[in-house]
């Protein structure tokens, strides 16, 4: 992420981790 605000970087990182986890759960269900 290219944000100047470190808080936004943290939020983006957490969001990407959540998305990745959701993708893994989806793949496991299929």
From Swiss-Prot:
InterPro entries: CRF. Regulation of fluid secretion. The keyword Secreted applies. This is Diuretic hormone 2. It is found in: Secreted. The keyword Hydrolase does not apply. Its main location: secreted. Belongs to the sauvagine/corticotropin-releasing factor/urotensin I family. Prolonged ingestion of diuretic hormone 2 by M.sexta neonates results in reduced food consumption, slowed growth and reduced developmental rates. A high percentage of neonates fail to molt into second instar larvae and death usually follows shortly thereafter, suggesting the possible use of this insecticidal peptide in plant protection. GO terms for molecular function: hormone activity. It comes from Manduca sexta (Tobacco hawkmoth). Keywords: Amidation, Hormone, Secreted. GO terms for cellular component: extracellular region. The modification Valine amide is found at residue 30.
């Amino acid at each position: 992420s290219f944000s100047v605000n470190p808080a936004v970087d943290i939020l983006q990182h957490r969001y990407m981790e959540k998305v990745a986890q959701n993708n893994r759960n989806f793949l496991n269900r299929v």
